[in-house]
């Protein structure tokens, strides 16, 4: 499909061809959900921990004799039913990461790109370059383009001034093409691709 290219100033800068195999797929929310769940599981720290009865700092001696007191039979005060005892089946330090086939991950990325195209939430910019690293100036440019919540994807090398100027603007993310991912595409309103990013995606999925 043919897609209009704009400059950061909002002027026309020609057209670019977008492959239907990447940007023209029918939506599959189940695949997107699987990929996002996989991404978030990888990010989760998993440092949660509660001490079990073997780990709490408390005597392990029998509380009182077995018979003759008329009270219930107990052994260690570390048991979970007692205040200060260990937690039964508590959380342990672990990795929440799980496997997801590479083909499903690749399909998820293409589906996310297609969903943004279908929602008319994609803008292609000829070049993501800022003359100076000034947040105020770049924020004004974004406001003119109507970009209040957006993910910018540049080429393999990001322009230093653009990256610095954009990083203090709320709800704006800037990533090189290597960092493109389903979660960041879905969580932001608009997807802004540079021409270099489009070419890299075409090369990646051809």
Curated annotation (Swiss-Prot):
Gene Ontology CC, one term: ribonucleoprotein complex
Chain intervals with Basic residues compositional bias: 64-77
Listed GO MF terms: rRNA binding; structural constituent of ribosome
The protein's assembly and partners: Part of the 50S ribosomal subunit.
Family: Belongs to the universal ribosomal protein uL4 family.
Function description: One of the primary rRNA binding proteins, this protein initially binds near the 5'-end of the 23S rRNA. It is important during the early stages of 50S assembly. It makes multiple contacts with different domains of the 23S rRNA in the assembled 50S subunit and ribosome.
Name of the molecule in the record: Large ribosomal subunit protein uL4
Gene symbol of the encoding locus: rplD
């Amino acid at each position: 499909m043919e897609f209009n290219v704009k400059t950061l100033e909002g002027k026309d800068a020609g057209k670019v061809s977008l492959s239907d195999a990447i940007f023209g797929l029918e939506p599959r929310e189940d695949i997107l959900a699987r990929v996002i769940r996989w991404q978030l599981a990888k990010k989760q720290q998993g440092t949660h921990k509660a001490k079990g009865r073997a780990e709490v700092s408390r005597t392990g001696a029998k509380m009182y004799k077995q018979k003759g007191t008329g009270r219930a039979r107990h052994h260690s005060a570390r048991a979970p039913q007692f205040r200060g005892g260990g937690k039964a089946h508590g959380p342990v330090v672990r990795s929440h990461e799980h496997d997801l086939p590479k083909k499903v991950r690749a399909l998820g990325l293409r589906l996310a790109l297609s969903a943004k195209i279908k929602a008319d939430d994609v803008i292609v910019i000829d070049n993501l370059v800022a003359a100076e690293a000034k947040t105020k100036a770049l924020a004004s440019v974004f406001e003119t383009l109507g970009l209040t919540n957006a993910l910018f994807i540049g080429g393999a090398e990001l322009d230093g001034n653009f990256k610095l100027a954009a990083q203090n603007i709320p709800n704006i993310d800037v990533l090189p093409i290597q960092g493109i991912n389903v979660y960041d595409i879905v969580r932001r309103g608009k997807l802004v691709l540079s021409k270099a990013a489009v070419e890299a995606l075409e090369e990646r999925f051809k």
